């Protein structure tokens, strides 16, 4: 089982009303939430941990998790409000207005941490849930508690507009990355850290600081996976891009699902992946249609919502004409 640990929120996506007026409609979202949903819909045993509100928005989140076969029993259900994000899309790129003060997700503490059984093989962390207090400290404490015995995956998913104290957040990401087995960065994430060197040098930096597998996504140029012994670069797949909301989150699910499906989700095996296993990890074009179509379909629908329902509906094996950007 893979436990995804991080934010769940309601994305208010722009919609036109029946009268032609501008409005918004609620959809379940959040970076780590999206990864959990993708894993569950791929048939990977998945659980999710965060704080979820006992309100109508929280019901949307829980119903979506249940429908995607994600176990939400580790979640802390509280009377605090839900996090709401109003989304503006410009040329497929999203900007957000967040309402997060005192919310169920933000206010979790170490008292809310779940007990984990032997069936939990890996934990996945990242994104904006690592920024504020007290939830940022809470997720870091969970990683510290479990890092010695389970695979740890981290996607910093840097959002500079939400980070008010860059040195503090950078220090947290560095501490967590040093204890993580898998670390995924976008090229924009790496720019934020301000380190010098090309991607090969930057991957070596993070490997030398503790990571066993580093994956770097490069938009239309594809992705590269690194261990201390080898590097594999995989080109991107051509799709029709509607927007990129949740694309990186789905990519994270693809990495974890690939390792799980190939029985490689242990600390020792992640550290010693052969070339084919390394290629499978960052490759959105997995040899199984069911695996490789997930990130491609994600790019072809609007928002991080009903995209994966198309896995069973779409049997066309031929990719569309635009470029997939992880």
UniProtKB/Swiss-Prot annotation:
Enzyme Commission no: 2.7.1.4
Organism: Rhizobium leguminosarum bv. trifolii
PROSITE patterns associated with the record: PFKB_KINASES_2
Catalytic class of the enzyme: transferase
UniProt feature, compositional bias: Basic and acidic residues: 307-326
Listed GO MF terms: ATP binding; fructokinase activity
Sequence ranges of Basic residues compositional bias: 287-299
Similarity remark: Belongs to the carbohydrate kinase PfkB family.
Region (Disordered): 275-326
SS bond partners: none
Reactions performed catalytically: D-fructose + ATP = D-fructose 6-phosphate + ADP + H(+)
Name the record gives this protein: Fructokinase
SUPFAM superfamilies noted in UniProt: Ribokinase-like (SSF53613)
Pfam families, alphabetized: PfkB
Alphabetical UniProt keywords: ATP-binding, Carbohydrate metabolism, Kinase, Nucleotide-binding, Transferase
